[in-house]
UniProtKB/Swiss-Prot annotation:
GO terms for biological process: CDP-diacylglycerol biosynthetic process. The lineage of its organism: Eukaryota, Viridiplantae, Streptophyta, Embryophyta, Tracheophyta. The keyword Thylakoid does not apply. This is 1-acyl-sn-glycerol-3-phosphate acyltransferase 2. Present in roots, leaves, stems, floral buds and siliques (at protein level). Widely expressed. In contrast to LPAT1, it is not expressed at higher level in leaves. GO terms for cellular component: endoplasmic reticulum; endoplasmic reticulum membrane. It comes from Arabidopsis thaliana.
Length: 389
C-alpha cells in the first residue's frame, strides 16, 4: 500500500496540476474564442487536450509497458485517422477507452477522439472536464431526455474540421461474469442468440448515430477487444503501479453507405455484428489470438514521453520557485496546507481509479422480459441509452 501511494501520488501531482492548467486554458478558449469561431476553438482545443491525454498514453506505453496488438487488414489500417468514423466496440476491460486513445494517437487523431458516455463522467476531476470541453456526448440514460441530446450532439459534429472518431459502447456497460449470466438468461427467455463472450447490444444509440451521421461519416470501425489468457487483465491501478498487460484488438471496417436505411434494420445489423463478434471471440479463446488475421505494427512513439518530460520539467521548476516564494515548509500552517493538497490529489486519483473499475460500473436498467414480438426488434431489456463508462 505504501509503495502504491509512493507511485500514485507523484503521478497524480503531475497529472492533476498539468490537467488543471489545461482545463483553465480550455475554459479561456471556450469563453473567448468559441463564440467567434467554433472551428478555430476546435483546432486549438485538439492540440491542448492532447497534451493532457498523452500523459495517460505515456502511462500505458512507457510506464506500465502494456502491449497492444492490433489485427486488421492493410486497407482498414491505412484508412484509420484519415476519415470520420463511428467506432463500435465491446466493453471488455477497465481501460478500453484508453486502448481507443492509444489507437487514435497512433492514427493521428487523439485530440479529436470522442465518445458517448454517461453524464456523471464529465464531473471526474480534470479528465472529465477536458472531455466536456472536447465535445464528448454525455447522456443521462433516460431516452426521453437523451434522444434529443444525442441527436443534436451528433449533428453538431457535421462541420468538425479534422477527422474524428466517435466511440460507442453499445453493450451499455462493462463486461463481467454476473452481467453475462443475466444477459444469457434474458436471451434464453426471449429466444435470442445466447451470448458467450459479449453482452446483448442496446441499439437505440447506435441507430441514432447511424441515422444522424450517415451523410458525413463514411466508415464504421468494428473493434473487438480481448485479453489473452496468458496476460492479467489491465486496470487503472495496475497501470499506475507500472504492471504490464497485453491487449488484443481486432478491427474491421464497414462502409456506412452499405448499412440498411430503416431503424429496425439498422438495429438488427448491430445485433448481427455482435453475434459475429461473439463467434470471433470463441476463436480467440481457442487460439489465444485472432487466427488468420494480419497483425499490424503500431509501434511506441516517443511523443507521449516527450510531453510528460516537458510537463515534469515545467512543473518541477514552477514548484521550486513557488515553494521558495511561499516558504510553505517554514511554518506548521504551510505544512498543513501542503499535506491537505497532497490529500486532495490522492483522493482525486482514487476517484479516477474507482470510476474505472468494472465491478463498480452501474448495470443498465432492465425492465421485465416480455414475450418476443417479431415486429419490434428493439428488445424489452434494452436501456434507454448507451453509455461508455
Amino acid at each position: 500500500m505504501v509503495i502504491a501511494a509512493a507511485v500514485i501520488v507523484p503521478l497524480g501531482l503531475l497529472f492533476f496540476i498539468s490537467g488543471l492548467a489545461v482545463n483553465l486554458f480550455q475554459a479561456v478558449c471556450y469563453v473567448l474564442i468559441r463564440p467567434l469561431s467554433k472551428n478555430t476553438y476546435r483546432k486549438i482545443n485538439r492540440v491542448v487536450a492532447e497534451t493532457l491525454w498523452l500523459e495517460l498514453v505515456w502511462i500505458v506505453d512507457w510506464w506500465a509497458g502494456v502491449k497492444i496488438q492490433v489485427f486488421a487488414d492493410n486497407e482498414t489500417f491505412n484508412r484509420m485517422g484519415k476519415e470520420h468514423a463511428l467506432v463500435v466496440c465491446n466493453h471488455r476491460s477497465d481501460i478500453d477507452w484508453l486502448v481507443g486513445w492509444i489507437l487514435a494517437q497512433r492514427s493521428g487523431c487523439l485530440g479529436s477522439a470522442l465518445a458517448v458516455m454517461k453524464k456523471s463522467s464529465k464531473f471526474l476531476p480534470v479528465i472529465g472536464w477536458s472531455m466536456w470541453f472536447s465535445e464528448y456526448l454525455f447522456l443521462e440514460r433516460n431516452w426521453a431526455k437523451d434522444e434529443s441530446t444525442l441527436k443534436s450532439g451528433l449533428q453538431r459534429l457535421s462541420d468538425f474540421p479534422r477527422p474524428f472518431w466517435l466511440a460507442l459502447f453499445v453493450e451499455g456497460t462493462r463486461f463481467t461474469e454476473a452481467k453475462l449470466k443475466a444477459a444469457q438468461e434474458y436471451a434464453a427467455s426471449s429466444e435470442l442468440p445466447i451470448p458467450r463472450n459479449v453482452l446483448i447490444p442496446r441499439t437505440k444509440g447506435f441507430v441514432s448515430a447511424v441515422s444522424n451521421m450517415r451523410s458525413f461519416v463514411p466508415a464504421i470501425y468494428d473493434m473487438t477487444v480481448t485479453i489473452p489468457k496468458t496476460s492479467p487483465p489491465p486496470t487503472m491501478l495496475r497501470l499506475f503501479k507500472g504492471q504490464p498487460s497485453v491487449v488484443h484488438v481486432h478491427i474491421k471496417c464497414h462502409s456506412m453507405k452499405d448499412l440498411p436505411e430503416s431503424d429496425d434494420a439498422i438495429a438488427q445489423w448491430c445485433r448481427d455484428q455482435f453475434v459475429a463478434k461473439d463467434a470471433l471471440l470463441d476463436k480467440h479463446i481457442a487460439a489465444d489470438t485472432f487466427p488468420g488475421q494480419q497483425e499490424q505494427n503500431i509501434g511506441r512513439p516517443i511523443k507521449s514521453l516527450a510531453v510528460v518530460l516537458s510537463w515534469a520539467c515545467v512543473l518541477t521548476l514552477g514548484a521550486i520557485k513557488f515553494l521558495h516564494w511561499a516558504q510553505l515548509f517554514s511554518s506548521w500552517k504551510g505544512i498543513t496546507i501542503s499535506a491537505l493538497g497532497l490529500g486532495i490529489i490522492t483522493l482525486c486519483m482514487q476517484i479516477l481509479i474507482r470510476s474505472s473499475q468494472s465491478e463498480r460500473s452501474t448495470p443498465a436498467k432492465v425492465v421485465p422480459a416480455k414475450p418476443k414480438d417479431n415486429h419490434h426488434p428493439e428488445s424489452s431489456s434494452q436501456t434507454e441509452t448507451e453509455k461508455e463508462k
